Every structure is written in C-alpha cells, then in structure tokens.
Swiss-Prot record:
Its main location: nucleus. GO terms for biological process: embryo development ending in birth or egg hatching; embryonic digestive tract development; endodermal cell fate commitment; female gonad development; gonad development; gonad morphogenesis; male gonad development; mesodermal cell fate specification. The lineage of its organism: Eukaryota, Metazoa, Ecdysozoa, Nematoda, Chromadorea. This is Beta-catenin homolog sys-1. Disruption phenotype: RNAi-mediated knockdown reduces the difference in the relative level of expression of helix-loop-helix protein hlh-2 in the SMDD/AIY neuroblast by comparison with the SIAD/SIBV neuroblast. Low level of ectopic expression of tbx-35 in the E lineage. Ectopic expression of irx-1 in several posterior sublineages of ABp. Loss of ref-2 repression in several posterior sisters of the normally expressing embryonic sublineages. Guts are missing in about 3-10% of embryos, but this increases to 100% in transcription factor skn-1 or Nemo-like kinase lit-1 mutant backgrounds. It is found in: Nucleus; Cytoplasm; Cytoplasmic granule; Cytoplasm, Cytoskeleton, Microtubule organizing center, Centrosome. Transcription coregulator. Part of the Wnt signaling asymmetry pathway, probably acting downstream of putative frizzled ligand mom-2, Wnt/frizzled receptors lin-17 and mom-5, and dishevelled homolog dsh-2. Activates or represses target gene expression, depending on upstream Wnt signals and interactions with transcription factors, such as pop-1. Required for the activation of Wnt-responsive genes in the E blastomere; thereby leading to a role in endoderm specification and gut development.
Length: 811
C-alpha cells in the first residue's frame, strides 16, 4: 500500500504483492548493476554499504585480502574488471532466469563482496533481524544493506527463500522469485525513465524492459492499459536513441541502443502487439524535421560508416530487421501505404543508396536494403524513373549514378567473390550464403525497377543481359532461378536486336537443357520464345545451337497433363510446353511460302528435327492437351491456342509429311486429331467470359476453324471433318458481329460448305441467320461472296421474305 492508502498500480495492473513504503527501492540482487561492472569511462563514486543499526561495531581479524599490499589489491581488481569486460556485450539472459547471472555466480559474488567488507557472518550466529539484499536507491547504482525484520516482511513461502549457512535469508536470490519480480522492475523502469538522467541506470532500465518482453511477461499487461503501455515504451525508445548531453563512449551507446532497438524489433512481430502496430508505424511519421526526428536518428544508425564498427554494426542490423518485419508483417494496405510514404525522404534514400557504391564490399550490404527499396518504389513510377535516369533523357544509356548501373556492379562484384567457392559448403559458409542472398535480392529489385520499355532497353544497353548470364554460371538453384526470371522479363526488349548474343544464347540453351528446375526451364524457354520473335539473326543463332532439338526434348520429358495431379505443377508444365511451341512457330514461319516469295531453305538437320514433332508420342501428348477435361488450369487456354497454331504451321511447312497425321489415335478418347480439335472447340464456349481471356478465346476459335480447313485442304480430311461436326455447334453462329475478320468469315463459310457437301442432313439441324448469310452473298470481297453463295445453295428455301434482305451488304 502507498502512504496514501491506495494500492500501487503499474502497466500490468496492481502489483502482485505489497511494495515497501519507500517505493524507489526494490531489494534484488538480480539487478544488472550488481552483476555487471560499471562501464569504463563513467564515474563510479565509492558508495559504501550501510550496517545494521543493532550491529555492535567490532574490528574483525584482518582477512587474507586485507593483508595484501595496495599494489597487489589494485592488480587483482583490475583483473576482475578486465574479466567482466570480456563478457559479450550483446549476450542475452536466459529466458528462464531473467537478466541475472547463474545462481552459483550470484552466491560467489555475494560472499566475495561480504568478505571484502569484513562482514562478520562467519563469526556470529544469525541475528534476530537479518540483513536483506542489495538494491539501487533512487534510480542510481548505490548499494545499501537494508535491515529488514524477516518475521514482518516474509512475503513468500520458505520454498521461495534462499538460506545461507548461518540461517540468515537472502530474499530475491531464488530464481523463481527473481522471475516474479521482473514485472515490478520493468514497471518501475518504465515509470522512472524520464526522471533518471544517469546513463548507467538508463542502460539497466533498458535491459530490464527488454528482459521483461523477452520472457513474455508483457502478455500479462491488462488489455485496457495495453495501448498506453505500448506508447510509453515507444516513447522510451525514441528518447533513448537521442544522444546524451554528456560525452559517453560509443560502446555505451551500442549497448543502450541495441537493447532499445531489440524491444522495437520484438514489437513488430509479437502477436500481442499486432493490434497496436499502427503505433509503431507512427514513430516514423515526420515530427521535428531536424536531427531529433526519429527518422533522422534511424538514418544515423544505418549509416555505412557504422558497418566498420564491431559494436554499432549490431545496432544497424537491428534497424534493418525492424524495417523487414514491418514491411513483411503488416498486411493492412492503408497502413503499408502510410509507412511507405514515411520512408520516402531524402536522407533515408541517400543513406541506403550509399551501400550500392562500387567501392563498398558486397558483404557489407544487408539484404533488407533491397526489400526497403522495393517497398518504397513498388507503386511509384516517378521514383523508379528518378532512380534509373536521374533526370537524364530516356533514349540514352542509364547514367553511372543511376541505380541500374550500381546494381549491375553489385551483381558482378558479388559473383567475383563467390566464383571460386565450393557451393557444397553453403550450409557451413555464412559469408557465401550472404553474398548469394545479395545477388538474388539484386535480381528482385531490378525486376521491379524495370517497369517500362525505356527502362528495359536501358538495362539491356548497359550489358545487363551479359551480367545476368555471367552470374547464373554459379551452380546455385535459387540464384539461377532468380536470374532466369529477370532474363524473361527483359526478353522482349527492342535493344536485344542490337545486342551480340553469339555467346549468350548457346549458354542459355545448355543451361535449360541440363537444369532440372521447372522454374528455370519456364523462364529460359520464355526468354528464347521472345528473343527469336521478329529477329532473324537471333533465329539463326538459336537454330545453329540445336534449339529445335532442345524444344522437342523438353516437351518429350514431361508427362501428359491428365497424369499430373498437382495443380501448380500442371500449370507450370502448360506454360513450358506453350513456350516451346511458340518458339517452334517462330522457326516454322521462315520455311512456309509467303505471297511475296520470301522463304528460307531449311537444312537437312533442321528438317529432321522439325519432323520429330509429328511423331506418334508427341502427337498423342499434344492431342491430350487439347481435349483433357476436369482440370482448372489457367495456362490451358493459351496452351490449346498455341497447339492449334503449331499444327497449322506444321501442316503448311513444305517438307513436313502429312500422310500419317490423322492415323494417330489417342488411347483415352479413341479419336484422331480432328476429334481432339472439335473437343477443344466445344470446351472454349464453356469457359467463363472476362476481359483478360476474351482475346485468347477468340483466337482459339479462329485457329480451330483454320486448322479444320487446313486438314481438309492438305490432308484430304473433308469427309472426316464432316463426320465429327455432330459434336460442335453450327460455326455460322460465330459470324454474328461487326468486328469479325474477313479471313475468319471466309474460313467459316468454306468449312460449313464442305461439311454440308458430305453431310447434307446437317442443313436440317443447323439453325442459321438466313438474312445474314444472304447479305454475305453481296460482300465486296469476292471470295467471301462466292463462298456464301455456295453455302446458301445447300440450305432449303424456307423463308418467303428472304429476297427482301438479299440486297444487304457487309463490309
């Protein structure tokens, strides 16, 4: 009870047991000031313990230590101080014991202090009033012996009391009791922080609060008081990060700031703090716009200069972990936007950019720096352009001060450090793991930074593709995966047409061939597909490097889609096969005759490799991709459209034999290629309509009709197509629209005409828009008008008003 009679309360509610009248005294030998020597360089007045008032003063026999010479005693004390200073500055107390040293050390140091003070415990029986433990008084580190009547102040059972050999008791030496009092010590530290100017006491308070939170005692705080308690601790952290008015050694600040920053770091991920994480974010809000601003203090802690200091380096790492925890842990979009806005100020960006200077060793770069950059530029196009161009013209190579050039240097510099190291030593080599992480984060940041065609072209012009292919030579799966992903992103750059790829492309093809990772194969085949499009010299390089054989090998090694049960795996296989076929289509276009007569001649090796794509195994696999049902795969629509395109080009290629194509029967559906094409045609109309897939669906329908027409013309399959027409709706319904392409109109009319030629009964079943069809007979395109007249003649005349609409024209 307080002197006023009111119960004392802390952030956790009422204290667990009554406090002594003098509330500023907490008897405990577990306080850090008892177990740690005063910091060198700080004044330590020679405070002396107070003797018990009933103790009769008598001079004990001189102890062995008292008989030592002053010089020998001074030497012994210096050795003790040196031993205590050798303890690690950042060692954390055991969660089960709190901030105190082990019990045997407590007992030894207590007895040592007693012997040094010539306390006559060993020569007298236990007095009726036993001396209590030591404590700091009024927030400082002065030690005193409190005379306490144990019969009046025995607040705990005997199991929580520790007895000395002569029967006296030492209240708080018991570890269980120390755990009970850590909450009181933390509450008092929070309450007295701003009234305690003494630096050492502030350090002890910071350690006490940190220990209290580390031991999950913070969860005992009353929920009603939790917001206020969190804010009090955040205010303490803010105040503690400010420099003290007196000059203190940097090692002192390193200890103080490390403990305060560790408290803040724990606030960013503790589940009990998550409802109040907005209070942590508000700390980064601009306040004073001066050196005392919290953001300015944080920038000082992560300065590149501190990375060379063995003590302050730990504080900088704590700050980076705080940033990382907030960015990765906060899910509220409004709060994330607010935090990103707080971080967009010049000093922070400049401080972080210093780590990317060429003269900085890559081992000094914390991977969290890349995460911070990604966070602040993710939705800011203007900031991305500034980092890339520094207000220079976009049609020129990026300036040396831009982030692209710096990140390329980081990439190459890190690779040079890891090139000679054995990748198998990665689990035991933290330096190697750190450098690999730096390279991967560099790839990720570049992927976000290259947000438009100008940025991508600038990256390619600065030899970014060459840098990536150099780095991915190191045999690490994560590194190769990240590098190939970035290659895929820049693969459609216009600047690649002027980039020498004679050495780059063969290396990538070998990498795709030997690497087992699906992500690497997907990114590599995607890069190949884009880079050969509309670039004839790149096609020649790829063909000379056996790219066609590689495409066949990749498709052959994957199982059928209906044999894959894992949905992500199935979707990735869809995308890989699609990339391979798209690349093949770019090659086939060179050998198909065009109206202007520009056609390249394929060599014997190319002809042999292309013909492998109509072999039985490949045909069956591609047919199953067209017709397999019962799977929700996002990439299936694009894959089926690409397969249809591949069959169209293969059948139009002069040197590809067509005779045996329709003789291949799939085991599941017992149908040849025509049946699978009709299945894909019916499937596409069952897919939901949305703006993202609308164009792909229309493309699939157009390619279905085109392929059926090619089969009729190239393979003589008119009768077979007519027989399979029972499974599809009337294609004439596809012509109801104003945006239909003339080529598609002609193909639909011809296919329907051939179907009715071999199956006239279909005319009685199909429901058509006769006025629309009659209007097409007057189309300005003579081929369309001719096909419409031929088709119209196959339908019975059953509309007396048909002639009224016969003069309509479609353009």
């Amino acid at each position: 009870m307080h002197s006023t009679g009111e119960p004392q309360r802390g952030p956790a509610g009422p204290y667990h047991h009554p406090m002594p009248y003098h509330v500023d005294q907490i008897p405990t030998t577990s306080h850090p000031s008892w177990h740690q020597a005063p910091h060198p360089g700080l004044p330590t007045p020679p405070y002396h313990p107070q003797q018990h008032p009933n103790y009769i003063s008598m001079q004990p026999p001189p102890s062995q230590q008292q008989q030592m010479t002053p010089q020998a005693l001074s030497t012994q004390q210096q050795q003790q101080v040196q031993q205590q200073q050798q303890r690690q500055l950042y060692s954390s107390p055991s969660p089960s014991r709190g901030p105190a040293a082990p019990a045997q050390n407590q007992k030894f140091r207590t007895e040592q202090w007693i012997n040094n003070q010539a306390w006559p415990y060993s020569q007298s029986p236990a007095p009726p009033v036993a001396p209590s433990v030591m404590s700091y008084h009024q927030g400082d580190d002065r030690m005193s012996m409190l005379s306490v009547n144990t019969t009046m102040t025995n607040q705990f059972p005997d199991s929580q009391r520790c007895y000395s050999s002569n029967g006296s008791t030492c209240e708080n030496v018991n570890p269980e009791m120390m755990q009970m009092n850590i909450t009181q010590a933390a509450e008092q530290a929070i309450r007295l922080w701003f009234n305690t100017p003494d630096p050492m006491q502030r350090l002890h308070m910071a350690k006490t609060i940190r220990t209290w939170i580390r031991q999950d005692k913070f969860a005992q705080v009353d929920q009603a008081n939790m917001p206020n308690c969190v804010q009090q601790i955040l205010n303490i952290i803010y105040d503690g990060l400010k420099p003290q008015p007196v000059q203190l050694p940097i090692s002192y600040y390193a200890q103080l700031w490390y403990n305060l920053l560790d408290i803040l770091r724990r606030f960013t991920f503790l589940p009990i703090i998550s409802p109040y994480i907005h209070q942590v974010v508000q700390m980064f809000c601009p306040r004073e716009n001066g050196p005392q601003d919290f953001r300015e203090l944080i920038c000082n802690l992560i300065s590149l200069n501190w990375q060379k200091d063995p003590h302050m380096k730990h504080c900088a790492n704590q700050v980076f972990q705080i940033f990382n925890c907030i960015i990765m842990g906060v899910k509220n979009e409004k709060l994330r936007t607010e935090f990103a806005q707080h971080l967009k100020f010049e000093k922070l960006v400049g401080t972080l950019s210093e780590y990317f200077n060429p003269q900085v060793h890559p081992g000094m770069i914390n991977p969290a720096i890349f995460i911070i950059f990604r966070f602040i530029i993710s939705k800011d196009t203007r900031l991305k352009d500034y980092f890339i161009w520094n207000n220079n013209p976009h049609d020129q190579p990026p300036p040396p001060t831009g982030l692209i050039i710096k990140l390329n240097a980081v990439m190459i510099g890190s690779y040079r450090l890891i090139a000679g190291q054995n990748p198998e030593t990665l689990p035991q080599n933290p330096e190697l793991a750190h450098l690999i992480q730096v390279i991967i984060r560099t790839f990720d940041l570049l992927g976000l930074l290259l947000h438009d065609s100008d940025a991508i072209d600038g990256f390619v012009r600065s030899d970014g593709v060459g840098a990536i292919t150099t780095v991915v030579q190191y045999p690490n799966n994560d590194l190769i995966r990240a590098g190939c992903k970035l290659l895929l992103q820049v693969s459609d750059a216009k600047a690649l047409a002027k980039t020498p790829l004679e050495n780059i492309l063969p290396f990538l093809l070998r990498l795709i061939e030997i690497h087992p990772d699906d992500e690497v194969i997907y990114s590599g085949t995607g890069f190949l597909s884009n880079v050969v499009a509309h670039k004839q010299h790149v096609k020649d390089i790829a063909i000379r490097s056996n790219a066609i054989f590689l495409l066949h090998t990749i498709i052959s090694k994957y199982p059928r889609l209906d044999e894959l049960t894992d949905a992500p795996k199935r979707n990735r296989v869809c995308e890989i096969i699609c990339n391979c076929l798209r690349t093949l289509n770019n090659f086939l276009m060179m050998w198909i005759p065009t109206p202007n007569g520009e056609t390249k001649t394929a060599g014997p090796n190319e002809k042999q490799q292309v013909c492998k794509f109509i072999e039985i195994d490949i045909l069956k696999k591609l047919m199953s991709c067209l017709s397999c049902e019962g799977m929700d795969t996002p990439g299936l629509l694009e894959l089926r459209s690409t397969i249809l395109r591949s069959f169209i080009l293969l059948l139009r290629t002069p040197f590809v034999p067509k005779d045996g194509v329709l003789n291949v029967i799939d085991e599941n559906r017992k149908e040849n290629l025509i049946g699978h094409i009709c299945a894909a045609y019916s499937w596409v109309f069952r897919q939901p309509n949305n703006t993202r897939t609308q164009s792909t669906k229309q493309q699939l329908v157009e390619r279905t009709i085109s392929l059926l027409l090619v089969l009729m013309e190239q393979c003589g399959a008119e009768k077979e197509v007519a027989q399979y027409s029972y499974s599809i709706d009337c294609p004439l319904n596809l012509l109801n629209g104003n945006q239909v392409k003339p080529t598609f109109i002609h193909n639909v009319l011809v296919v329907c005409d051939k179907i009715l030629e071999h199956c006239p009964t279909r005319a009685d079943i199909w429901t058509i828009d006769r006025p629309m069809l009659e209007g097409l007979t007057n189309h300005r395109n003579s081929d369309i008008a001719k096909a419409a007249n031929s088709l119209l003649s196959r339908f019975p005349e059953n509309d007396l008003l048909a002639g009224i609409f016969s003069n309509r024209e479609y353009f």
